[in-house]
Amino acid sequence: MQKLAEAIAAAVQAGQDKDWGKMGTSIVGIVENGISVLGKIFGF
């Protein structure tokens, strides 16, 4: 869950800095970590 929060924070910071490349990779990290969290919850 901590990695998900870190990915969200990185995406927000990248948006504020207008670093679109980093923002894109941060969004991928959010999706990746979100799927991992859901997998743990539902036992995938």
Swiss-Prot record:
Listed under GO cellular component are: extracellular region
Record carries keyword Hydrolase: no
Assigned keywords, A-Z = Antibiotic, Antimicrobial, Cytolysis, Hemolysis, Secreted, Toxin, Virulence
Superkingdom of origin: Bacteria
Q: What does this protein do?
A: Has hemolytic activity and also inhibits the growth of gonococci.
Q: Which Pfam families match?
A: PSMbeta
Protein name stated in the entry = Antibacterial protein 1 homolog
